[in-house]
UniProtKB/Swiss-Prot annotation:
Primary gene name: nadE
Name listed for the protein in its UniProt record: NH(3)-dependent NAD(+) synthetase
Sorted UniProt keywords: ATP-binding, Ligase, Magnesium, Metal-binding, NAD, Nucleotide-binding
Database matches in PANTHER family: GLUTAMINE-DEPENDENT NAD(+) SYNTHETASE, NH 3 /GLUTAMINE-DEPENDENT NAD + SYNTHETASE
UniProt key word Lipid biosynthesis: no
Lineage: Bacteria, Pseudomonadati, Campylobacterota, Epsilonproteobacteria, Campylobacterales
Binding positions (Mg(2+)): 37, 137
One example GO MF annotation: glutaminase activity
Similarity-based family: Belongs to the NAD synthetase family.
Length: 260
């Protein structure tokens, strides 16, 4: 297994290098939250681009203090260049204008604000924006359109969350990051498990079977239940996949009009 993950690391590093070169970039930038996914992407980018891989730390007014601490520790451990931009003043303006905004609206605003900072830095420094969303999030649509889902290339987009965790172990990501509950850190008390209703250790095996059995076909709940999955779990996950499938297909562009 150790050998397989070393091959995976080499493969993902090669992907980053070739795709950046293909687009004419020598530098990359990504958002570093202090969470697992961005830590893995950060270390991979550091392996390939060295000082030309730059992390942006963008805490909001509700970000947990340990998120910033963990991000800074990672930068120190792996000699990652970084810049901190607090988005707290901007989310404060949003909150003052939209006092009745839901937590989802507030979270989406912060996610899109972070992406605006990333793309502004990208233009300023001639850097390519690297994504940090994993396959579990992408299949479930668990992300913000034009926010954390936006990027030029993504090295971990085909890795399920549990696979990203295993990869992180082989990249020597600090245990504090490995052991904390997954969270987008978009509002106080938020966690992936609370939002999704299940831990990734339960969700990922189901997602893998859905991908293997129903690629380009309607998902059949009965077949999955026969494999031993809980019926409520199956129903909830299928509902999320179907509801958010459009996020993987955007933008939908009208075909060229051809008058007869």
């Amino acid at each position: 297994m150790q050998k397989d993950y070393q091959k995976l690391i080499a493969y993902l590093c090669d992907f980053l290098e070739k795709e950046a070169q293909k687009r004419g970039f020598k530098k990359v930038v990504y958002g570093l939250s202090g969470g697992l996914d961005s830590a893995v992407v950060g270390v991979l980018c550091q392996k390939v681009f060295k000082k030309n891989a730059h992390a942006l730390l963008m805490p909001s007014s509700v970000s947990m203090p340990e998120s910033k601490t963990d991000a800074l520790d990672l930068c120190e451990t792996f000699s990652i260049p970084y810049t901190e931009y607090s988005i707290a003043p901007y989310d404060a303006i949003f909150n003052s204008h939209f006092k009745d905004a839901s937590l989802t609206r507030k979270g989406n605003f912060c996610a899109r604000l972070r992406m605006a900072f990333l793309y502004d830095y990208s233009l300023k420094s001639d850097s390519l924006v690297i994504g940090t969303s994993n396959k579990s999030e992408r299949m479930l649509g668990y992300g913000t359109l034009f926010g954390d889902l936006a990027c030029a290339i993504n090295p971990i987009g085909e890795l399920f969350k549990t696979e990203v965790y295993e990869l992180a172990c082989h990249l020597n990501i600090p245990k504090k990051i490995l052991n904390k509950p997954p969270s987008a850190d978009l509002f106080v008390g938020q966690s992936d498990e609370k939002d999704l209703g299940y831990p990734y250790s339960v969700i990922d095996p189901l997602l893998k079977d859905i991908e293997a059995l129903f690629q380009n076909k309607p998902i059949d709940a009965e077949t999955l239940a026969q494999l031993g999955y809980d019926e409520i779990l199956v129903k909830n996950i299928i509902s999320r996949i179907q509801k958010n499938a459009f996020k993987l297909e955007l933008p939908t562009i009208a075909k060229r009009f051809n008058p007869k």
